[in-house]
């Protein structure tokens, strides 16, 4: 939403909490400097950020390997400028699926983006968002379904079924089906639902370029699998709500896993069975870490204590109710 704030031509301030404050914003700062757009930041370029002015139409360039959110932000804002603009993405491009979702959403609301290829876009100016269809179907979330599919595979006697999923979705995280199947999972697809049943897993190589949000829960699956799993091209996870690579390695190792950090990924030697558990672990104020550790608890011999469990509210407020519904057990401890 930063580019949208840079359309207002009045001071617009963005604030954040936790790790969000220190997430890199240099791609936007470079644009502001090039256009002479006044902005003020916190220490070392961190939030809060105040931008005062208005973006100008023209030629824009962004790196493709930092975050697709920078690209989506400009695609939302540039159509509202007075004249046409172009956007070039510098390779390598990661998380391309998220850009596809952005383009589809823009089209639904009357915005035209001319895409030459995955790296080049022409954005006509003087456009306006239109209400479009009175009713829009919101498809199921493969990112959230991934937690239950892993849970059904490693920690459920009766299996878990996720409904309302579109096999032809543009969501990159539908890769969970391919990855879990490659690891040996027993997945049954039927009429928009997927059922995951308990099955022994085997390690493999996982390229996280286009599905980084799957890494935390796939790390759990790999920790109890047989053999070695190598997660690669996942360096961007170090600048999410927390350093997710470090968080998952630290907390799962505390539960008895064997995980080594690498600059761009994780090397996981699976236990070929349950984790010992019985320890206190922390969610690092990160919703995906919290949900992944909850799934890990299903594959632990002893109960765990999870601090920061409330962080699931960022993306999945009903997670703990669903956790109980599929057979998980939890209780709140006052400390």
Feature-to-residue mapping (PLM):
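Short, structured segments at the rim of ligand-binding sites
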Residues: 1-335
